[in-house]
């Protein structure tokens, strides 16, 4: 079969053997695959990522000297089954699958491991138990977007954001746009998006952002202030506390301590917005901690591949919650597909181009400095070799 192989940072279309599905696995004919930011990172930073993965107990992440078929966002149709499968779906049935697979009792990441070729190819092997049938009303293009949207779904759920909270999305690349869509699907009424790129800001509007800001012109937190009263100075917060306690103690005997505790436990005391960091560059987290209102919640979704620095004392003095998120759960993956099927999210809003296998390398170059493009898909049956 034809596949896009990554070796020492170079991408080339090569002929490689069609995978033979192992125990419990299914062979799919790839219909669409998405180019992920993780693939862009893996192409140039895979050795650093592999070292980090080893620290958390995973030793199969790709290395630069290996020949790896990338692609962990995909949809395909059933071709054949390996031994031990339940064979739940007929040949030709379209499936999405979590990109995790077992080979010889070793768990590997599909498309990010030499032993588990990904979906930048005509065929891909997946785990039967992690596969989900695609409803008839969901297009191939939308189905290929389930995986990155699941990352956003997980980030939104882990953030604890409520419908009445104001959410701020810093960075409107594919993950930032996905977070915007999942925030709106979760019922969050006010979503502020921030990006230097005019093209990305327009995509953010299309994906549902209620306010869009160019940070070179205006701070996104100024837009936040227009939505709700937040505190940016500690003195103002202390003053508010004095006023509240004076009011609570006007009537002698009022159990003010219990009232304050109840208010705090139920989110009724002053807080900041929920900020999603979707850039992944050095200095961004510290910038958010510095500029965001007091008691903000910061959710780090963007992957910074370089050592970074924050000022813990500043974060402590502002009582900022800092949370890092990774991946998603199987139920979130399935629910994301359900959201697409029911029209709660529209992945097509962020898909800006499709190429064939021969166009993958050129697409990587464009996406590395994208202004116009956000999400690009690969169609193995297409002859398109360049983005327009």
Language-model features: locations:
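Glycine-rich beta-strand-centered segment in the early N-terminal region that forms part
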Residues: 19-33, 48-101, 135-137
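NAD(P)H dinucleotide-binding glycine-rich loop of Rossmann-like/cofactor-binding domains
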Residues: 60-67, 72, 95-170, 218
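Adenosine-nucleotide cofactor-binding segment
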Residues: 169, 184-282
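Glycine-rich Rossmann-fold phosphate-binding loop(s) that bind the pyrophosphate
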Residues: 171-174, 303
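C-terminal hydrophobic helical "lid"/dimerization subdomain
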Residues: 237, 248-252, 261-264, 282, ...
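ADP-ribose/adenylate-binding Rossmann-like module
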Residues: 277, 290-307, 322-323
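Rossmann-fold dehydrogenase core element
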Residues: 297-299, 310-349
